[in-house]
Regions:
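Small-residue-rich hydrophobic transmembrane alpha-helices
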Residues: 51-111, 148-167, 260, 280-344, ...
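Short runs within selected transmembrane alpha-helices of multi-pass transporters and secretion channels
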Residues: 72, 141-159, 167-175, 196-211, ...
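Membrane-interface helix-loop junctions in multi-pass transport and translocation proteins
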Residues: 9, 175-208, 274, 345
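Helix-terminus/linker motif at the lipid-water interface of multi-pass membrane proteins
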Residues: 33-51, 121-128, 184-191, 253-283, ...
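Interhelical loop/hinge segments that connect adjacent transmembrane helices in multipass membrane
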Residues: 1-21, 200, 211-252
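Short membrane-interface helical motifs at transmembrane helix boundaries
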Residues: 108-139, 335-363
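Alpha-helical transmembrane segments of multi-pass membrane proteins
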Residues: 128-151, 283, 356-376
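Signature of the first transmembrane helix
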Residues: 15-76, 244-265
Length: 376
């Protein structure tokens, strides 16, 4: 690990960003693909009502992802910071407590969602026509949320341990499996949205298992059974370091909840109806999530670099890293803006087709909603 520490403190910033951010971006994109792939196959196999149903369930996944990223990114930042300060024992406590709190919160969220699923779906704008698809889909997805949360938390920590390729492989394995299982369950077994949910849970479990196996392979710290003791002071520090990721994700959840309800209310009085606007919003959000995954991935990949150099007192390298991240993000957002404004119909059609009203609202919503992506 000493070699890794020297690299973080001496290697060219652009090279380090690419090394740590690319696997991180791929991991986040793969995590997003679970929902995106579901929607693509559901759109062609069930129709836009099926897509609308997954859209009102999606915020529940985002809530869980917010906690997972808070604990994962927080623990990874804590790990890098303590390694920079040469405090390996403290670093191992941060890793262990990040994993422990993720396990506890994931189980609590799973139980809560299963108990209050219909009520939660109503909060996120579920209509009567969407409910018959959303409830069975959401119930199955909820069962797999602990695997998704713990796997995501571990993924962030594994990257900070200097093994971004392993983290990438674990996520890619699950995504490939999900892509294979989705058409089998939806079209071959004719299970509709339930089939898509089952495929997702199985794939998340595989990713979870691969990441769990890494615990004994940590290079920077030694994780023993004794290390797994709840320390609320450490949890507080870990959470504070990852709270920005939490706020980012939860703000998206709040936006989706408000927009679903507003679109459902006013859409029902228009020629589009309630379901078309809700479905379109979800699809637009999924495509937007691809861009967000890239931007967040760049930032998350920079965390170990910033954390180590800040802990080592190398403020010049910290500033250089921030400048590189901001300029890269601006360039990518500009390219995305051009695509979103010029070919919305092509992007929407990936998720299935609909009537004239559906496509009309889809193109309109796409251009308006993603008008300011350049500000990401």
């Amino acid at each position: 690990m000493e070699k890794e520490e020297n690299i973080l403190g001496t290697e060219k910033i652009s090279k380090l960003i690419k090394r740590f951010s690319i696997p991180c971006i791929i991991s986040l994109l793969v995590n997003s693909l679970y929902n995106i792939v579901d929607q693509i196959f559901i759109g062609w196999g069930v129709g836009y009502l099926g897509n609308g149903a997954t859209n009102v369930v999606f915020p529940l996944t985002m809530v869980c992802l917010a906690f997972a990223l808070m604990f994962g990114d927080g623990a990874s930042a804590y790990l890098s910071l303590k390694l920079g300060e040469k405090k390996k024992e403290e670093a191992s406590k941060g890793v262990a407590n990040g994993i422990l709190i993720s396990i506890i919160i994931s189980v609590l969220l799973c139980v809560g969602i299963l108990i209050f699923l219909p009520q939660l779906l109503n909060v996120f704008g579920c209509t009567e026509n969407l409910e018959k698809y959303a409830v069975p889909y959401g119930g199955i997805i909820a069962i797999g949320l602990p695997f998704m949360m713990i796997g995501t938390t571990l993924n962030s920590i594994i990257r900070a341990d200097g093994n971004p390729k392993y983290a990438m492989i674990s996520m890619v394995s699950g995504a490939i499996l999900n892509t294979i299982l989705d058409p089998i369950f939806i079209f071959v077994f004719n299970m509709g949205v339930e089939g898509a949910a089952i495929a997702t849970v199985i794939s998340q479990f595989v990713t979870f298992l691969i990441n769990i196996l890494y615990i004994k392979r940590f290079k920077s710290v030694i994780i023993k059974k004794e290390t797994f003791k709840l320390n609320f002071n450490v949890i507080k520090k870990v959470s504070s370091l990852g709270v920005s990721s939490f706020i980012t994700q939860m703000s998206i959840v709040l936006v989706i909840a408000c927009e679903n309800n507003v679109l459902g209310k006013y859409g029902s009085d228009s020629k589009y109806g309630a379901e078309i606007p809700i479905t379109v919003l979800g699809i637009v959000m999924k495509i937007s999530q691809i861009l967000n995954s890239i931007i967040i991935g760049i930032a998350a990949g920079a965390q170990p670099i910033i954390g180590y150099n800040y802990g080592a007192g190398k403020t010049k390298r910290v500033k250089e890293t921030l400048k590189y991240v901001l300029l890269t993000s601006l360039g990518i957002s500009t390219i995305a803006f051009i695509l979103f404004q010029t070919i919305p119909d092509k992007l929407i059609s990936i998720f299935g087709t609909g009537d004239e009203n559906y496509m009309e609202f889809a193109c309109l919503g796409f251009r308006i909603y993603l008008m300011l992506v350049i500000c990401n």
